[in-house]
Amino acid sequence: MLILLPAVDVVDGRAVRLVQGKAGSETEYGSALDAALGWQRDGAEWIHLVDLDAAFGRGSNRELLAEVVGKLDVQVELSGGIRDDDSLAAALATGCARVNLGTAALENPQWCARAIGEHGDKVAVGLDVQTIDGQHRLRGRGWETDGGDLWEVLERLERQGCSRYVVTDVTKDGTLGGPNLDLLGAVADRTDAPVIASGGVSSLDDLRAIATLTGRGVEGAIVGKALYAGRFTLPQALAAVAE
C-alpha cells in the first residue's frame, strides 16, 4: 500500500507552504509542532519535516525540529540543509527515521557517497527535477542552481548504493497541478530502490494514480498543499490509497 507522508515545511518555527519552492511565496499555517501533531492525530505513520531556512541557507530551525521529532510517536523523514557532517549528525541525532540529502548530493558527490555508505537506509536522496527543452535537469539549493542531468546523477547514486529516492517535479510543487506520473515511473524503472513521489498532488484521484505505480517501485507520496488547502482530509487520503 502507498505510504502517505504529510509535509510540514518550516520557516522561522512556523509551518508554511511554498509555490514551486520559491522563497517569498509562503502561506503560513501555524506552529510546526501543532501541524505535525495534527497529522499524527489524523492517522499519519510518517511525517515529512523540512527546514526551509536551512535549505535556502538563511538559518536553521534545528532545535525546534529536534523538539518536534521528540514529541511525535510516528516516523519522521527530515529534510533541508543537510549537506555536511555537522548538519547530518544533528539531523540524525533528532531521532528521525531517515534524512533526505538534497543539494549536497549534487555538489559534493564524495561526501554524499560516504553518508550513504555509513548510514545506509537512514539516508535518502532528493531528486528535484525540472524539465528544460526535453531534458530532465536536477535543481540544487532551494531549486535555484542546476545540478546536472537526472539520469547521469541517478546512475552515480545507484553505484553508491543509495537506498531511496524522493522525486519532486519542481514545476508541480505547491501548485496543486497534479503529479508527474511519467517522471515517477521512469525513475522507478531505473532503480531497485524505493521511490517517494513529491509535488503536485491535488486530489484523491492523484493519490490513486500514484498508487498504481507501487508495483514499479513507488513506495510513498508526500502530500502538502492539498491537505493544508482542504482539498481532502488525511483520513480520506489514507482510505483512498487503501482501496
Curated annotation (Swiss-Prot):
One of its GO terms (molecular function) is 1-(5-phosphoribosyl)-5-[(5-phosphoribosylamino)methylideneamino]imidazole-4-carboxamide isomerase activity. Pathway: Amino-acid biosynthesis; L-histidine biosynthesis; L-histidine from 5-phospho-alpha-D-ribose 1-diphosphate: step 4/9; Amino-acid biosynthesis; L-tryptophan biosynthesis; L-tryptophan from chorismate: step 3/5. It is found in: Cytoplasm. The active site is at D9 (proton acceptor), D128 (proton donor). The keyword Cell wall biogenesis/degradation does not apply. CDD domains: HisA (cd04732). Its main location: cytoplasm. GO terms for biological process: L-histidine biosynthetic process; L-tryptophan biosynthetic process. It catalyses: 1-(5-phospho-beta-D-ribosyl)-5-[(5-phospho-beta-D-ribosylamino)methylideneamino]imidazole-4-carboxamide = 5-[(5-phospho-1-deoxy-D-ribulos-1-ylimino)methylamino]-1-(5-phospho-beta-D-ribosyl)imidazole-4-carboxamide; N-(5-phospho-beta-D-ribosyl)anthranilate = 1-(2-carboxyphenylamino)-1-deoxy-D-ribulose 5-phosphate. Involved in both the histidine and tryptophan biosynthetic pathways. This is Phosphoribosyl isomerase A. It comes from Mycobacterium avium (strain 104).
